[in-house]
């Protein structure tokens, strides 16, 4: 199942706000920008995979689906009120679900958007 539409950043202006004001976190294959303090009962996510990563839309869409699946995996742990943009870097083209899972867990933890009251192993 994909990421519910209520949990997605959909508008260009929302992406721009996160790009301009969000705090940057980087891992080897992913870059994440996080903007907090939004008064909402959930966090919203946007995923960007540029044509620098792959010219083929099918490849870019596959990467986005994998990242959305990882976000769904962590959804019970994610604190509300954040807008997050995840950018796949060109070297991320060869990543699989498990690699994205490890990297996003580290990035979410680094950014402070995961509630550590839940154990990851409990979710698996």
Curated annotation (Swiss-Prot):
UniProt-listed PROSITE patterns: RIBONUCLEASE_P
Originating gene: rnpA
Protein family: Belongs to the RnpA family.
Superkingdom of the organism of origin: Bacteria
One GO molecular-function entry: 3'-tRNA processing endoribonuclease activity
Enzyme class: hydrolase
UniProt protein name: Ribonuclease P protein component
EC number: 3.1.26.5
Catalytic reaction annotation: Endonucleolytic cleavage of RNA, removing 5'-extranucleotides from tRNA precursor
Gene3D superfamilies in the cross-refs: 3.30.230.10
């Amino acid at each position: 199942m994909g990421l519910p539409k209520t949990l997605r950043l959909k508008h260009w202006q929302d992406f721009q706000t996160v790009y301009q004001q969000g705090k940057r976190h980087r891992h080897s294959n992913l870059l994440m920008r996080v903007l907090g303090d939004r008064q909402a009962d959930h966090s919203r996510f946007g995923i960007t995979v540029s044509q620098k990563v792959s010219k083929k839309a099918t490849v870019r869409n596959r990467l986005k689906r994998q990242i959305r699946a990882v976000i769904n995996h962590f959804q019970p742990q994610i604190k509300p009120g954040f807008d997050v943009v995840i950018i796949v870097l060109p070297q991320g083209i060869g990543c699989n679900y498990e690699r994205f899972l490890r990297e996003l867990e580290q990035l979410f933890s680094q950014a402070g958007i995961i509630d550590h009251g839940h154990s990851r192993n409990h979710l698996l």
